[in-house]
């Protein structure tokens, strides 16, 4: 029996024959096919163990947070889909709604601390705007197409938003005691903002809707606990508005994670997150301390002088990540460090 016939018999193809072709022809074709399969199998088996050997568990997902309206109350979820533009939970996406003033500029808790008391939730086909001592407002998930498209600015960059209507505008303006506020929604057909326009270290493909710069912010419980050990009054993770909070790792371990794997999701670290007055707003009361924890962070979390061109003189706390591979992550998922 020839080598080709032996291989076919071994794989159960002894009766295989291409009608109308000489024996030598179909044996050659079959042998080439088997060789390709064998080479592919060997390559896959060699690559897969190497990748697995590079994995090192560095923590566990402890909390997941989505902030549907920029600067407003966060929504704690047990699982979320990781997309290129941030976390998604059902119809709610991270920072896909925005409060603007009459000039179209973003309004955040830096200027209006009480924004952190406003929540946006979703049930079935209805959104609910709510805040303490204020009657809830029900809104459709998608604003009517007849509502105007408004030109908005987030950190000086132009972006569109679909106006959510007069009722929403009046509700937000009344709660904040501001005139002429509007609530807008980012729609899929709209052009996102380029993260690279904010910081050159981002890739061309990194994009966001109304987030400051990055689709994902990662913070560890250990880092938060270290900060709290230096403060007279403890602060929460939500003071820093992270998307993914990690437990079971060392203090500031997230600063050195270049790429992590959570389930099927791969995230790549881009840069540290600089901190501003927003961190001084109590997420439970909407009152700004105007000092802490920012002053304490400045005492020990400034960047290396060689990185001042990137971070300036603002303290850094937490890390910005961008998406490498999409998927779903859940509270309790192990976090693996991919090979450096």
Curated annotation (Swiss-Prot):
Required cofactor(s): Mo-molybdopterin
GO cellular component terms given for this protein: mitochondrial inner membrane; mitochondrial outer membrane; mitochondrion; nitric-oxide synthase complex
Residue ranges, Cytoplasmic side: 45-340
Keyword Zinc set for record: no
Catalytically driven reaction(s): N(omega)-hydroxy-L-arginine + 2 Fe(II)-[cytochrome b5] + 2 H(+) = L-arginine + 2 Fe(III)-[cytochrome b5] + H2O
Chain ranges on the Mitochondrial matrix side, renumbered to this chain: 2-24
Co-factor note (free text): Binds 1 Mo-molybdopterin (Mo-MPT) cofactor per subunit.
Transmembrane segments: 25-44
Highest rank taxon of the organism: Eukaryota
Region (MOSC N-terminal region): 96-186
GO molecular function, one term: pyridoxal phosphate binding
EC supergroup of this enzyme: oxidoreductase
Residues with lipidation of kind N-myristoyl glycine: 2
Keyword terms of this UniProt record: Lipoprotein, Membrane, Metal-binding, Mitochondrion, Mitochondrion outer membrane, Molybdenum, Myristate, Oxidoreductase, Signal-anchor, Transmembrane, Transmembrane helix
Membrane topology: Single-pass type II membrane protein; Lipid-anchor
Record: residues binding Mo-molybdopterin: 70-71, 95, 214, 241, 243, 274-276, 320
Stretches assigned to the MOSC domain: 191-338
An individual GO BP term: nitrate metabolic process
E.C. number(s) listed in UniProt: 1.7.-.-
Subcellular location: Mitochondrion outer membrane; Membrane
Chief place of localization: mitochondrion
Pfam families: MOSC (PF03473), MOSC_N (PF03476)
Record note on domains: Comprises two structural domains, the molybdenum cofactor/Moco sulfurase C-terminal (MOSC) domain and the MOSC N-terminal region, forming a cleft that accommodates Moco. The MOSC domain, which contains a large seven-stranded mostly antiparallel beta-barrel, engages multiple interactions with Moco both pterin ring and phosphate group, allowing for a tight coordination of Moco within the core of the enzyme.
Function recorded in the entry: Catalyzes the reduction of N-oxygenated molecules, acting as a counterpart of cytochrome P450 and flavin-containing monooxygenases in metabolic cycles. As a component of prodrug-converting system, reduces a multitude of N-hydroxylated prodrugs particularly amidoximes, leading to increased drug bioavailability. May be involved in mitochondrial N(omega)-hydroxy-L-arginine (NOHA) reduction, regulating endogenous nitric oxide levels and biosynthesis.
Subunit and partners: Component of a complex composed of cytochrome b5, NADH-cytochrome b5 reductase and MTARC1.
Protein name (database record): Mitochondrial amidoxime-reducing component 1
Organism: Mus musculus (Mouse)
Lineage: Eukaryota, Metazoa, Chordata, Craniata, Vertebrata
């Amino acid at each position: 029996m020839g080598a080709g016939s032996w291989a076919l018999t071994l794989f159960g193809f002894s009766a295989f024959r291409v009608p109308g072709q000489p024996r030598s022809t179909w044996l050659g074709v079959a042998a080439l096919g088997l060789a390709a399969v064998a080479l592919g199998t060997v390559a896959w088996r060699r690559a897969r163990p190497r990748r697995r050997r590079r994995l090192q568990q560095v923590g566990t997902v402890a909390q997941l947070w989505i902030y549907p309206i920029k600067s407003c109350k966060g929504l704690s979820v047990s699982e979320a889909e990781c997309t290129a533009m941030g976390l998604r939970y059902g119809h709610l996406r991270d920072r896909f709604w925005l409060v603007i003033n009459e000039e179209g500029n973003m309004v955040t808790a830096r200027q209006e601390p009480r924004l952190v008391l406003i929540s946006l939730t979703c049930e079935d086909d209805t959104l609910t705007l709510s805040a303490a001592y204020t009657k809830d407002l029900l809104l459709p998930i998608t604003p009517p197409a007849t509502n105007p498209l408004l030109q908005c600015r987030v950190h000086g960059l132009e972006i569109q938003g679909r106006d959510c209507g007069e009722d929403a505008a009046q509700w937000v303006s009344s709660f904040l005691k501001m005139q002429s506020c509007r609530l807008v929604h980012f729609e899929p057909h709209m052009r996102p903002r380029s993260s690279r326009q904010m910081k050159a270290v981002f890739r061309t493909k990194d994009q966001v809707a109304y987030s400051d710069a990055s689709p994902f912010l990662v913070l560890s419980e250990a880092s938060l606990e270290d900060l709290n050990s230096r403060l007279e009054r403890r602060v929460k993770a939500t003071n820093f508005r992270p998307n993914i909070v990690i437990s079971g790792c060392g203090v500031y371990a997230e600063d050195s994670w270049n790429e992590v794997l959570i389930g099927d999701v791969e995230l790549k670290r881009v840069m540290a997150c600089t901190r501003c007055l927003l961190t001084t707003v109590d997420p439970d009361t909407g009152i700004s301390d105007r000092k802490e924890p920012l002053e304490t962070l400045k005492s020990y979390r400034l960047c290396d002088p060689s990185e001042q061109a990137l971070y300036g003189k603002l303290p850094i706390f937490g890390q910005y990540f961008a998406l490498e591979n999409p998927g779903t992550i859940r509270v309790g998922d192990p976090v693996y460090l991919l090979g450096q």
